Amino acid sequence: MLLSYRVFAQAAETGLPDILQRIKPSVVAVGTYLPTRNPRAVFLGTGFAVNDGRHIVTNAHVVGKDLDSDHMERFAVFYRENDKEQMQMAELLTVDQQHDLALLRLAEAKLPALEIGDSTRVREGALYAFTGYPIGMVLGLYPVTHRSIIAAISPNAIPVVNSRQLNINMLKKLETPYNVFQLDATAYPGNSGSPLYDIETGKVIGIINKVFVQGSKENAISNPSGISYAIPAEHISRLLAGK
């Protein structure tokens, strides 16, 4: 039984290098651009192109900041094309706070779009991958890929030790629960908005949106828990249908 799983995993992973060639051109760094600021570009998270290639899906919390419109601050995406770093301005079209999703529209050129898969068919134990910018653009625009199994399909509200840790957002999640994918992979704050995809087909089955943090927020980088979460892609499909 163990041998058969290893053979299956190895067979699936042999196609990952080819799939990555299709995935990486669609993955962008999401941030803001302000001409009078130093630095002018500030990284917020990851996103990826969908539909016609001019629409970018990311997390609602990634684009949750208020823009300094008086000084012409705008959302922007950053990516590498033909080995050159590129930037495009983007407009925030819609936000789904309940499922932590947001949709941006590019101002100019379109990017290769990723296909949204059927997340209702995802099973625990299946192997997937996600690609994004875990520590931002510090090392340049080079998206990083991690593999992960679906460790569990569980409610979106993370358990708390005592009632003092409860907040309004957590209570809202308890009122309108839905399932998310729990992963056995280490994701970092910059991975928010990264596509979680099938390593055989490249179809997106989820979007990374949070990590389980032990202690303070700084521990997300210095002492990661190795537990991450992704929103199923069925909610992305609904967002796109209503755009």
Feature locations, PLM:
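C-terminal segment of classical bacterial N-terminal signal peptides
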Residues: 1-8
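N-terminal activation segment of mature serine protease catalytic domains
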Residues: 9-49, 56-59, 99-101, 238-243
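Active-site substrate-binding loop(s) of clan PA
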Residues: 18-19, 66, 91-93, 107-142
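Active-site region of chymotrypsin-like
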Residues: 23-40, 106-115, 144-242
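Short, well-ordered loop/turn sites that connect or cap secondary structure elements
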Residues: 50-51, 122, 199
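Catalytic-histidine neighborhood of serine endopeptidases
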Residues: 51-97
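Short, conserved beta-turn/loop elements at beta-strand boundaries and strand-helix junctions
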Residues: 52, 95-99, 153-159
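Beta-strand/loop subdomains of soluble extracytoplasmic proteins
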Residues: 73-76, 81-90, 124-129, 143-164
